[in-house]
């Protein structure tokens, strides 16, 4: 029985707890720099898990919703980190040059685009879908995790996004 419990515990994905300390991590960005969450200690940080091939991510970028949220975050002195956890050979995997081209072509505003090809940080944070958003306050406490807004679903469109309750912006206001 102990062996079965141990086996179960080892296969349960880790995840972070809202209102608890956000775990530190270190990843390489699209320019080859090593970036750690702790580099931004004292600042609010937004984490965006992304996959450019995801239709929901595409809609948020195509409509400008993600970019306007990034601008709002910057205007409120938050650091925006975009994380790609796609492994080589899987949907959404990109090399540095393509990640930088996507940032430019989508007119996005992340401070860094980070690569997590083994998915270790994604597992640590429990990031399961894209876009999956996290807001960490200046003290390092996770204040929000989940969807960018309440406009989800298969049929969401620009009208839905314009009327949506943006959870990331709300978390940044608190």
Descriptions of predicted regions:
Residues 8-24:
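N-proximal helix/coil linker or "cap" segments that precede and/or mark the start of modular domains
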Residues 100-137, 142-143:
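Short, internal strand/loop/helix patches
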């Amino acid at each position: 029985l102990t062996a079965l419990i141990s086996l179960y515990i080892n296969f349960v994905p880790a995840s972070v707890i809202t209102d608890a300390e956000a775990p530190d991590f270190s990843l390489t960005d699209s320019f080859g720099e090593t970036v750690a969450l702790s580099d931004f200690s004292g600042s609010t940080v937004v984490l965006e898990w992304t996959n450019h091939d995801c239709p929901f991510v595409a809609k948020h970028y195509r409509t400008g919703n993600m970019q306007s949220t990034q601008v709002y975050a910057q205007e409120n002195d938050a650091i925006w980190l975009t994380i790609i956890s796609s492994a080589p050979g899987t949907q959404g995997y990109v090399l540095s040059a393509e990640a930088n081209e996507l940032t430019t072509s989508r007119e996005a505003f992340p401070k860094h685009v980070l690569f997590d090809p083994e998915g270790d940080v994604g597992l640590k944070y429990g990031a399961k879908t894209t876009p999956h958003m996290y807001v960490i306050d200046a003290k390092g406490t996770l204040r929000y995790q989940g969807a960018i807004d309440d406009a989800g679903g298969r049929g969401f469109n620009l009208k839905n996004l314009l009327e949506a309750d943006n959870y990331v912006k709300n978390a940044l206001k608190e």
